[in-house]
Amino acid sequence: MPVVSLAELLESGVHFGHQTRRWNPKMSPYIYTARNGVHIIDLVQTAQLMENAYEYVRKSSEQGKRFLFIGTKRQAAGIIAQEASRCGANYVNQRWLGGMLTNWETIKGRVERLKELESMEENGAISRRPKKEAAVLRRELGKLDKYLGGIKTMRKLPDVVVIVDQRREYNAISECQKLGIPIISMLDTNCDPDFADIPIPANDDAIRSIKLILGKLADAIYEGRHGQLDSEQDYEDFDESISDEYDDYEDEEEYEEQDLEVDASEDE
């Protein structure tokens, strides 16, 4: 039985690329045709490459390798959190902080601070502080959880990274390349396949397309860790309304990295 059928790919809109004027010529081998000024991805290749990606991920998971899902745009953020959590992977679905991988020791210190504040909140220690001090601590807790909550259980650098929207996540990709971390990437028609170790040609803008691809990769991780997937297990479908909480993300005031005491200059 194939990992994903052509019918599933079509139904999820995986074949829709970008306008032809916005393409990257390096994606030409993965493009089937152009219709009404929009490139159409070759789903036969997508299906085959999904088979390859699934098997790679399953075997890596079976070997105990660690995975990190990265996708910070609104359409992907909720799905990233849901699928990574389902299969036991870590994730980043808010703004990528410079040095998150290349300056991991510093980031790890902030993760420990997050855990400390969570413990203080749970045991009532924050509530016992003066009102103003408690508010400051809760604000710090909120910021740390927003940006680092998805990597709270990540004790070491990931062995494999899964990327949604290569062009948006170029900083994360650059750090992975510096560290030699393999990259599995959804590649829309405006992407560069040279920056993906394991390419999956697919629409990286549509929620249903992102859900299908990430869901299959999460299945592979789960299968590698726990054995064959239970066909009767009813995984909750992604609620598209979840993405509403990310609607204002682009309009947010830029988050100051110094609030997390991250010094990206240590990367150099």
Swiss-Prot record:
GO terms for cellular component: cytosolic small ribosomal subunit. It holds the Pfam family Ribosomal_S2. Residues 231-268 have a biased composition (Acidic residues). Residues 228-268 are annotated as: Disordered. It comes from the Bacteria. InterPro entries: Ribosomal_uS2, Ribosomal_uS2_bac/mit/plastid, Ribosomal_uS2_CS, Ribosomal_uS2_flav_dom_sf. The keyword Ribonucleoprotein applies. One of its GO terms (molecular function) is structural constituent of ribosome. Disulfide bonds: none annotated. Keywords: Ribonucleoprotein, Ribosomal protein. The keyword DNA damage does not apply. GO terms for biological process: translation. Belongs to the universal ribosomal protein uS2 family. NCBIfam families: rpsB_bact (TIGR01011). PANTHER family: 30S RIBOSOMAL PROTEIN S2 PROKARYOTIC AND ORGANELLAR (PTHR12534), SMALL RIBOSOMAL SUBUNIT PROTEIN US2M (PTHR12534:SF0). This is Small ribosomal subunit protein uS2.
